[in-house]
Amino acid sequence: MIDSTAVAAGHAKQPFYKHLYFQVLVAIIAGIALGHFYPTFGEQLKPLGDGFIRLVKMIIAPVIFLTVATGIAGMNDMKKVGRVAGKAMIYFLVFSTLALIVGLIVANTVQPGAGMNIDPATLDAKAVATYADKAHEQTITGFLMNIIPTTIVGAFASGDILQVLFFSVLFGIALGIVGEKGKPVTDFMHAMMYPIFKLVAILMKAAPIGAFGAMAFTIGKYGISSVTNLAMLIGTFYITSALFVFVVLGAVCRYNGFSIVALIRYIKEELLLVLGTSSSEAALPGLMSKMEKAGCKRSVVGLVIPTGYSFNLDGTNIYMTLAALFIAQATGIHLSFGEQILLLLVAMLSSKGAAGITGAGFITLAATLSVVPSVPVAGMALILGIDRFMSECRALTNFVGNAVATIVVARWEGELDQEQLARVLSGKEEFTSIADVDALPASVQPAE
């Protein structure tokens, strides 16, 4: 084991410009400036962002497999697996529904689309046809069946998080059941965690480059001026998401003995990475490592975080109901209380059916509107141009929601070291980055 005091002391001497969060922040600002002043060149930098995200996705499957399988194999009671999963799903259902309700309430109160008086017949339905077609392809049954991989290799080859998680849980249970006979396999997997997380640390060094390219492309392609036309909707969504994080999730954090502000400060590097790349998957390995370092047992971290990436989408849920009512208001369509409840129920189901798909937020909205006849699907053309600017906020809110969920479920299950959590969140035991190799062994230390 590494002396955490010595590690923290080493961090204190590190210049601020060597911290990953500072490098990513500078890269984001530079990307915005380049995209604004040289938009054509900025658009050409898209491969930098895409390449970095692909690099991270490359190692997500082994990180999940090793974390989940070793965590479950180390459980003395296999019933804990079902109990942790059950508590996590209850938490996800409650807060996903709450996020949808918050979106409805804010949309009815602020009415960001009121007064636009847009004729639905003048909207270009072709612009959103691709999203609508993808939405129709998704069903709850199809989604559930897709969790089961056709082959083990196929799950890892496709990088499907839920398929990898499904196999990892079953494999971990099998390892736990065979006991001592499976110990060589468990020891090998523990040993494999060191080079895998070392690889994660190496890849994270490229995070500023990825964030720079992704932000330069976004601003270069869509332009800052495109935001001003629908600033009311964007502002309403950002403020609502911030209130949800600091008020709703903040209250949950206080009830469970920690501060939402301290938690956000602890995961600031991952949040900046999500902001820069618009992909919460890019920060998944870092979040898993930090949650374990914060005192959550590996078995809980391995189950809650990957599952939450598909089922605990607070930001996406706020966006769905808020955007749906915005379209209705902008096109002069009045939705009754009953129609809004229908919208809420459909959104609850469709958000699960479209989980894990690229552009899931927009596709889920298309799926919801296609079932609710009162609101025209073509109305999505109104927000197509600014959706990219709202995707960052969706991803950030989803990310914070999953961090909170992990700690809360770990505490419910009695699998949280609260003293360790307090030390880490107070800064007494610093863990600055997944890219900080010195800190990694403590978070992947084999179970005694």
UniProtKB/Swiss-Prot annotation:
User: What PROSITE patterns has UniProt attached to this entry?
Assistant: NA_DICARBOXYL_SYMP_1, NA_DICARBOXYL_SYMP_2
Q: Which domain of life is it from?
A: Bacteria
Tell me which InterPro entries the record gives. Answer: C4_dicarb_transport (IPR023954), Na-dicarboxylate_symporter (IPR001991), Na-dicarboxylate_symporter_CS (IPR018107), Na:dicarbo_symporter_sf (IPR036458)
Location of this chain's protein in the cell: Cell inner membrane
Q: Does the keyword Electron transport apply?
A: no
- GO terms (BP aspect): L-aspartate transmembrane transport
Q: Which UniProt keywords apply?
A: Cell inner membrane, Cell membrane, Membrane, Symport, Transmembrane, Transmembrane helix, Transport
- Its topology with respect to the membrane? Multi-pass membrane protein
* Record family assignment: Belongs to the dicarboxylate/amino acid:cation symporter (DAACS) (TC 2.A.23) family.
Q: What does this protein do?
A: Responsible for the transport of dicarboxylates such as succinate, fumarate, and malate from the periplasm across the membrane.
Specify the protein name.
C4-dicarboxylate transport protein
Can you name the source organism? Agrobacterium fabrum (strain C58 / ATCC 33970)
